[in-house]
């Protein structure tokens, strides 16, 4: 059991593709009537545990919600017949059910893409967006060959022995021993076939969402965070182009890879805290 299971309330939402598990912690209205809502969205194949350090830091002063996306973590079994827009709709239904209105979306990798899809579908509902090792959803940033390769990730993963894939993924996504151990723990919660199929499906779903997205214009402050040692695809290049094109502030997280909030939670938490002060002004 971790801090999320120990201190947050587990709730469930029955989506068309399966039951979705999520965890909620509310700050006492008497203690902080204006406490913001932080919505944590893990990346592809990751689960809620990747945000443990953020929950520990902010749950005393902020309302927090974190989920396991469909087919991830405890949100299994689930039918792999959903789009990124469907995921945004499921999240929207959850937030409505919890009576959460203005909120700050904090998405790591795939979670950042989901946040952008959410803001495109439900403009004006989000008070702030923090991208952690994610990239823009708009198709102008991507070459056709890049999206083609993304769509064929499953075959590449299946060509690698499972134990080797676990070790390579842990080393590729994290820089620290803790980050790599946490990535391994998330991966071994799946069978080999389950992981490869989920990853392949998720990347195809993402590529299709990017191809269909010509423009996203968040109606809120945006902060881009990226591990200085992120070696996942072209994430660093995408973030450089993203900040150049939009003017969104980009902060490089030291001593961190693709899972920057796990590798260097102190630096990421400091950036989140600073962002919250800016949004609350």
Label the model's feature ranges.
Residues 2-19:
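N-terminal cap/lid segment of alpha/beta-hydrolase-fold proteins
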């Amino acid at each position: 059991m971790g801090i999320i299971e120990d201190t947050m309330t587990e709730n469930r939402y029955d989506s068309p593709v399966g039951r979705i598990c999520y965890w909620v912690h509310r700050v006492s209205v008497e203690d902080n009537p204006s406490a913001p809502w932080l919505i944590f969205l893990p990346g592809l194949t990751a689960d809620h545990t990747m945000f443990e350090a953020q929950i520990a830091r902010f749950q005393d002063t902020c309302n927090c919600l974190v989920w396991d996306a469909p087919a991830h973590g405890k949100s299994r079994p689930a039918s792999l017949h959903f789009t990124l827009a469907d995921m945004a709709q499921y999240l929207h239904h959850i937030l409505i059910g919890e009576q959460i209105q203005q909120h700050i979306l904090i998405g790591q990798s795939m979670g950042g893409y989901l946040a952008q899809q959410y803001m495109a579908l439900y403009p004006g509902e989000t008070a702030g967006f923090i991208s952690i090792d994610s990239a823009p959803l708009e198709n102008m940033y991507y070459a056709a060959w890049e999206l083609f390769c993304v769509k064929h990730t499953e075959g590449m993963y299946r060509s690698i022995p499972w134990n080797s894939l676990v070790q390579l993924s842990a080393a590729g996504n994290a820089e620290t021993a803790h980050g790599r151990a946490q990535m391994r723990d998330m991966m071994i919660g799946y069978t080999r076939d389950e992981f490869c199929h989920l990853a392949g499906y998720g990347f195809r779903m993402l590529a299709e969402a990017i191809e269909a997205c010509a423009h996203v214009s968040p109606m809120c402050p945006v902060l881009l965070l990226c591990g200085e040692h992120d070696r996942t695809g072209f994430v660093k290049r995408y973030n450089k182009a993203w900040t150049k094109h939009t003017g969104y502030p980009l902060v490089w997280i030291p001593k961190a890879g693709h899972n920057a909030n796990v590798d260097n939670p102190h630096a990421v938490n400091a950036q989140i805290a600073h962002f919250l002060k800016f949004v609350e002004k």
